[in-house]
């Protein structure tokens, strides 16, 4: 029979109606001869009642045979429940069953299909189709669908064109490792799965499309963590003839629409703007979490003359003040924080506490002469804890920034209901890579340098600034963008600054350079990580919760066993041989 409606949509106005519902058996309870069943479908739970006095014997036998996760079809009359259940939307009604059909049976599931069930991540991924039946998981994907629907409507209304770009592209050397796809037809040649549609969307601007967007899969072969996956989805935008401010205005409007339509929140526009240098110096991060204070403070000048060489001879000494919580941290706790600090390159962690108006702790004896100055500078009061890092500026910032975030979580200083958006602007064009021993693009090699600093492409690369902007939400990089280079000579200078020979640049990017000979317009854009955005909106801490079939931390799928070995015949067709490294 045809389903009348979703089980989760039945309400008091349907009392007296005969309905046919379909779904899964949740709980089954036998009470005084009556059988009660929770019927679950996408929209919720509906209580079924089977009374042996009202149904045929065969219907009762079927009801008694039902087990969790059986798929059933039921027909009956909607009645008012004697005792309403205010915890569910259908709690005022129940279905008095007349007919039951078993559409499919089920083995006992490896875990109970309910929210809050304790089960390992690996088991959840192994039986992902069961994990996704849980209501909280379904809600995550309803939210994701609302977000993408809102984004598409917004961009469509602004005359953006949705264009699909290739999945099989050319491998380029900048950025993370590519996922490579061997070509059967061109022996020894490989496609790459795109890390982003960066170059193709720029070429669409050269084609005169003016405004492009795409909600697109991207691929990066990199080490995984809670907010990364080997394949992920981004909201990709590119525009012609707009300034960075105009692009940011478009993105802010899009996010405001999403927040209103999915969370009912009116965000304040425009978003705050913070320079990269300020973010690093005050928050120790290029993606600062502004939901709490505890800013980094530079005390280098104050401690320069003291008789403590760790401070007086360090390139920089910076501190954070943990207000009113010194008594929460024992020496053992601080030792653990010291080990944590060493993960970021710090040699150690110095500390003091304020007790009864006096500085105490291992280094307090060296601070006697400047105690009053330090107390005023850091605005110290009783029960404050001060943590110092004396090191190179980058190490001090990174270490204290990480400690700041860790301590805020430990002390629950963060307003988890807040959504703090901001732009990080005025980026350096290049970052020094210790691993590579050279400067690398902070974003990518197509970013437009500021006019005032472009001459440093042939000078000190540390001084080149980019017309780039990242959008940050609650300490996460939500997305990044920039104005792009549209002139061939400047793009060639950029490649040269990155260490490309003329031949290498032509081999890797010759098609882009050639396109710049044909009236390439000024352009710029941005990409937002959709998975990360939805994760934050859903209040989750891992993007696996908002991706239907994600990979684990080994970039494998426990359900399908991907990646897997392939046959010798397949390898032969691709002219590939696998070397053993036993």
Swiss-Prot record:
ATP binds at residues 220-222, 229, 477, 529-532. Its main location: cytoplasm. Residues 198-201 are annotated as: Aspartate. Pfam families: GAD (PF02938), tRNA-synt_2 (PF00152), tRNA_anti-codon (PF01336). Its EC number is 6.1.1.12. It catalyses: tRNA(Asp) + L-aspartate + ATP = L-aspartyl-tRNA(Asp) + AMP + diphosphate. GO terms for biological process: aspartyl-tRNA aminoacylation. It is found in: Cytoplasm. Homodimer. This is Aspartate--tRNA ligase. It comes from Streptococcus uberis (strain ATCC BAA-854 / 0140J).
């Amino acid at each position: 029979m045809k389903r009348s409606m979703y089980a989760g949509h039945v309400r008091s106005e349907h009392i007296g109606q005969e309905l046919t519902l379909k779904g899964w058996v949740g709980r089954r309870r036998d009470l005084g001869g009556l059988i009660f069943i929770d019927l679950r479908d996408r929209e919720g739970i509906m209580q079924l009642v089977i009374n042996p006095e009202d149904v045929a014997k065969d219907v009762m036998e079927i009801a008694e045979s039902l087990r969790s996760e059986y798929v059933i079809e039921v027909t009956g009359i909607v009645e008012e429940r004697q005792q309403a259940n205010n915890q569910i939307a259908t709690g005022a009604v129940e279905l008095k069953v007349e007919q039951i059909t078993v559409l499919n049976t089920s083995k006992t599931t490896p875990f109970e299909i309910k929210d809050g069930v304790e089960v390992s991540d690996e088991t959840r991924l192994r039986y992902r189709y069961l994990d996704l039946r849980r209501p909280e998981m379904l809600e995550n994907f309803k939210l994701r669908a609302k977000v993408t629907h809102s984004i598409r409507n917004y961009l469509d209304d602004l005359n953006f064109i949705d264009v699909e770009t290739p999945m099989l592209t050319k491998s380029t050397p900048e950025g993370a490792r590519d996922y490579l796809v061997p070509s059967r037809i061109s022996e020894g040649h490989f496609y790459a799965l795109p890390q982003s549609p960066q170059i193709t969307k720029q070429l669409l601007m050269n084609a005169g499309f003016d405004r492009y967007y795409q909600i697109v899969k991207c691929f990066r072969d990199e080490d995984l963590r809670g907010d990364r996956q080997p394949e992920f989805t981004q909201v990709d935008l590119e525009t012609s003839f707009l300034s960075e401010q105009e692009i940011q205005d478009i993105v802010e409007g899009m996010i405001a629409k999403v927040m209103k339509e999915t969370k009912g929140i009116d965000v304040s526009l425009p978003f705050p703007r913070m320079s990269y240098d300020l973010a690093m110096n005050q928050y120790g991060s290029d993606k600062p979490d502004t939901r709490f204070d505890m800013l980094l403070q530079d005390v280098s000048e104050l401690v320069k003359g003291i008789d403590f060489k760790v401070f007086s001879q360090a390139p920089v000494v910076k501190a954070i003040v943990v207000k009113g919580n010194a008594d929460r941290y024992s020496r053992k706790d601080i030792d653990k924080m010291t080990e944590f600090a060493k993960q970021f390159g710090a040699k150690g962690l110095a500390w003091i506490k304020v007790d009864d108006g006096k500085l105490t702790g291992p280094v307090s004896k060296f601070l006697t002469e400047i105690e009053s100055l330090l107390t005023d500078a850091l605005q110290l009061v009783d029960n404050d804890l001060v943590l110092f890092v004396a090191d190179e500026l980058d190490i001090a910032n990174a270490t204290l920034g990480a400690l700041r975030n860790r301590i805020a979580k430990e002390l629950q200083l963060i307003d988890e209901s807040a959504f703090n958006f901001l732009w990080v602007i005025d980026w350096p064009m290049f970052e020094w890579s210790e691993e590579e021993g050279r400067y690398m693009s902070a974003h990518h090699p197509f970013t437009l340098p500021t006019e005032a600093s472009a001459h440093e492409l042939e000078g000190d690369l540390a001084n080149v600034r980019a017309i780039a902007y990242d959008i940050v939400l609650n300490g996460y990089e939500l997305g990044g963008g920039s104005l792009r280079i549209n002139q061939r000579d400047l793009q060639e200078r950029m490649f040269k600054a990155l260490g490309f020979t003329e031949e290498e640049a032509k081999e890797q990017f010759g098609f882009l350079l050639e396109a710049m000979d044909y009236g390439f317009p000024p352009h710029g854009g941005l990409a937002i990580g959709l998975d990360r955005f939805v994760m934050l909106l859903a209040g989750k801490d891992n993007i696996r919760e908002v991706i239907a079939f994600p990979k684990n931390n080994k970039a494998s799928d426990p359900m399908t066993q991907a990646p897997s070995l392939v046959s010798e015949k397949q390898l032969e067709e691709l002219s590939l041989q696998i070397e053993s490294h036993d």
